[in-house]
C-alpha cells in the first residue's frame, strides 16, 4: 500500500509521522509513505533566516537569526507537540526556551502608547482601570467560549453587548470603553487568521477566543510561551531528520504535485516535469485549500465547494532595523508590538504586528546577548509603510529577509467548511489535512488533525473500514476540538525513542 502526502507543512508531516507511528504501535503491514513538497524546504510558514551583524564588542562575529513566520508556541497547551519533541530529543532549555511575554499597544502618531504591564516602566504601564477590564474580558470570554449562546456572535457584538448581562458571578460587567478600540481589536489584528477586508470587529467571537485559549491561556491554565533556539526551521529540521532516519518516511522536496484519480488508484505528476510521476493508493492533501482546488484534478463537486469557502490573504514578513515601526518611546518596546488603528477609519486592516526580536528571543536571560551595545532588530508583518532596502536584513548570500506567506481567514465560512470536509474524509481515498481544516491552524491543531487522519488511514489500510461520517454541527465540532486541545489527560510519559 502506498500513501502520498501532498504538502510538506506541519500538517503534512504530522500525518506521515503519526501514520508511521500508528503501524509501529498497533502492528500490520506498514505502507510506503512519502511527503511531496513543492518548495525547497519543509515546514510551511516556519521559515528562519540567519544574519551576520559584523564584529561584536568582543571582537568576534555577531550572528543572529529571525523567524519570519511561526515563531513561538504555548507549551502548556501544545500537549502533542510537546510529546513529539520529547521523543525526537528536542528539549526545553537547549532547543526551546521561555520568551519574554510582553506586549505594547500604540498609535502611529505616538499619542497613545502603553505596555500590558500594570507596574510602571518609565511611564509606559497600562492604566490599571483598563488592565482590570482586559483581565475581566479574558476571564469571562474564556468561559463564554464554551457557551453555545455566542456561536453566531462577532467579536464586536460580544465586546459591545456582553456587558448587558451579568458576569458568571452575577455581578454587572463594567468594561472600560477603551477595551475594544485600544486592546482587543488591535490585538486580534495581530493574529494571522484575521481578515484585512473586514478587520477584527467582524471576526467570529468563537474564532478569536479559540486562539486566545490555546495560544495565550485565556480561560484555562497559564500559558508558557516558548521560542525556538536558532529558529522554528530548526525544529522542522529535527522532526524531518527523525522521520527519515527512524520512521522510513520519504521526504521529497521540489515536487509540485498534480493528482488525478484513476481506475488503479492515484497518479501524481510533477507539474514542472511531467516525466516525473508516482502512483499511490491513498492521497492526503495537506496543502492550503486554494492550492488543493488546483492540484487535485478529479475533485468531487461537493468537496470543491467546501474548499472554495476558505478565503486566503497574503502577508509580507520582513526582518529589519527600522525602528520607526515601533512605539515612539523606546521604554514601551516589547516582544509583541500592536498598532492601534483609528476607529472607523476607511482602510484595509490586515494582519499586522512588529516583534522586537531581541525580546522575543529573551536576550535578557541569555548571557551571550545580555550585553550593552548589541544591535536591536525587528520582524514586522505587513508593515504600514515600506521599509527601506538599506534597513532590510540579508543573509550571507545576500538574500533579503522577506517572506510572503498565505493564511486562511478563520471566519464563519471556514468554521462551516471544516465540518463539511470532515464528513468527506476518505471519499475516493482522498483525505485532507493542514491548518485550514482544523480550528485556527496552530501547530498543535495541525498535529491533532494528523493523528486523526493517521487513524483513518490505518483503518482503511488494515481493512477495518473507515466510513465517512455525517457532517457535524460546525460549532459543536469546533467546541469539541477545543476541549481536546491542551487536554492535560493526554499527557503521558514519552515513549522510548526508536
Indicate where each model-derived feature is located.
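Mobile amphipathic helical/loop "lid" adjacent to a hydrophobic cofactor/ligand pocket
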Residues: 74-204
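Conserved flavin/dinucleotide-binding core of flavoenzymes
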Residues: 349-498
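Conserved Rossmann-like nucleotide-cofactor binding loop
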Residues: 11, 41, 290
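Conserved N-terminal glycine-rich FAD pyrophosphate-binding loop of Rossmann-like flavoproteins
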Residues: 40-74
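Helical element adjacent to the flavin cofactor pocket in flavoenzyme catalytic cores
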Residues: 209-274, 278
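Mid-domain catalytic core of redox enzymes
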Residues: 22, 258-401
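Glycine-rich FAD pyrophosphate-binding loop
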Residues: 20-52
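Beta1/beta-strand and adjacent pyrophosphate-binding region of the FAD-binding site
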Residues: 1-11
Amino acid at each position: 500500500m502506498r500513501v502520498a502526502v501532498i504538502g510538506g507543512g506541519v500538517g503534512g508531516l504530522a500525518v506521515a509521522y503519526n501514520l508511521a507511528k500508528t503501524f509501529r504501535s498497533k502492528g500490520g503491514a506498514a505502507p510506503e509513505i512519502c511527503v511531496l513538497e513543492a518548495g525547497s524546504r519543509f515546514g510551511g510558514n516556519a521559515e528562519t533566516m540567519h544574519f551576520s551583524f559584523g564584529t561584536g564588542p568582543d571582537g568576534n562575529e555577531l550572528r543572529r537569526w529571525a523567524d519570519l513566520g511561526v515563531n513561538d508556541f504555548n507549551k502548556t497547551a501544545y500537549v502533542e507537540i510537546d510529546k513529539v519533541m520529547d521523543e525526537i530529543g528536542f528539549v526545553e532549555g537547549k532547543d526551546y526556551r521561555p520568551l519574554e511575554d510582553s506586549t505594547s499597544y500604540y498609535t502611529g502618531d505616538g499619542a497613545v502608547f502603553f505596555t500590558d504591564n500594570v507596574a510602571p516602566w518609565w511611564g509606559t504601564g497600562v492604566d490599571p482601570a483598563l488592565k482590570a477590564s482586559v483581565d475581566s474580558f479574558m476571564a469571562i470570554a474564556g468561559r463564554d467560549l464554551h457557551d453555545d449562546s455566542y456561536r453566531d456572535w462577532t467579536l464586536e457584538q460580544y465586546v459591545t453587548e456582553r456587558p448587558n448581562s451579568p458576569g458568571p458571578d452575577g455581578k454587572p460587567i463594567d468594561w472600560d470603553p477603551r477595551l475594544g478600540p485600544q486592546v482587543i481589536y488591535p490585538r486580534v489584528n495581530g493574529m494571522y487568521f484575521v481578515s484585512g477586508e473586514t478587520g477584527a470587529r467582524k471576526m467570529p467571537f468563537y474564532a478569536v477566543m479559540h486562539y486566545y485559549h490555546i495560544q495565550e491561556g485565556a480561560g484555562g491554565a497559564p500559558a508558557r510561551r516558548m521560542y525556538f533556539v536558532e529558529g522554528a526551521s530548526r525544529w522542522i529540521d529535527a522532526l524531518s531528520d527523525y522521520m527519515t532516519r527512524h520512521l522510513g518516511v520519504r521526504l521529497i522536496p521540489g515536487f509540485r504535485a498534480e493528482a488525478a484519480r484513476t481506475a488503479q488508484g492515484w497518479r501524481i505528476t510533477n507539474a514542472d516535469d511531467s516525466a516525473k510521476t508516482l502512483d499511490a493508493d491513498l492521497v492526503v492533501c495537506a496543502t492550503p485549500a486554494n492550492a488543493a482546488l488546483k492540484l487535485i484534478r478529479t475533485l468531487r463537486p461537493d468537496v470543491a465547494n467546501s474548499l472554495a469557502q476558505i478565503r486566503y490573504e497574503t502577508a509580507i514578513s520582513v526582518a529589519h532595523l527600522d525602528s520607526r515601526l515601533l512605539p515612539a518611546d523606546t521604554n514601551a518596546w516589547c516582544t509583541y508590538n500592536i498598532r492601534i488603528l483609528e476607529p472607523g477609519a476607511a482602510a484595509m486592516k490586515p494582519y499586522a504586528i512588529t516583534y522586537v526580536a531581541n525580546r522575543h528571543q529573551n536576550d535578557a536571560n541569555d548571557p551571550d546577548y545580555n550585553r550593552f551595545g548589541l544591535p536591536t532588530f525587528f520582524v514586522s508583518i505587513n508593515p504600514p509603510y515600506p521599509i527601506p532596502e538599506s534597513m532590510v536584513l540579508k543573509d550571507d548570500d545576500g538574500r533579503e529577509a522577506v517572506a510572503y506567506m498565505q493564511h486562511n481567514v478563520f471566519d464563519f465560512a471556514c468554521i462551516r467548511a471544516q465540518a463539511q470536509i470532515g464528513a468527506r474524509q476518505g471519499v475516493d481515498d482522498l483525505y485532507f489535512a493542514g491548518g485550514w481544516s482544523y480550528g485556527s491552524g496552530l501547530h498543535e491543531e495541525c498535529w491533532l488533525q494528523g493523528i486523526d487522519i493517521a487513524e483513518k488511514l490505518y483503518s482503511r489500510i488494515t481493512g477495518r473500514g473507515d466510513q465517512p461520517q455525517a457532517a457535524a454541527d460546525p460549532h459543536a465540532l469546533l467546541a469539541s476540538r477545543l476541549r481536546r486541545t491542551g487536554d492535560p489527560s493526554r499527557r503521558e510519559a514519552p515513549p522510548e525513542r526508536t
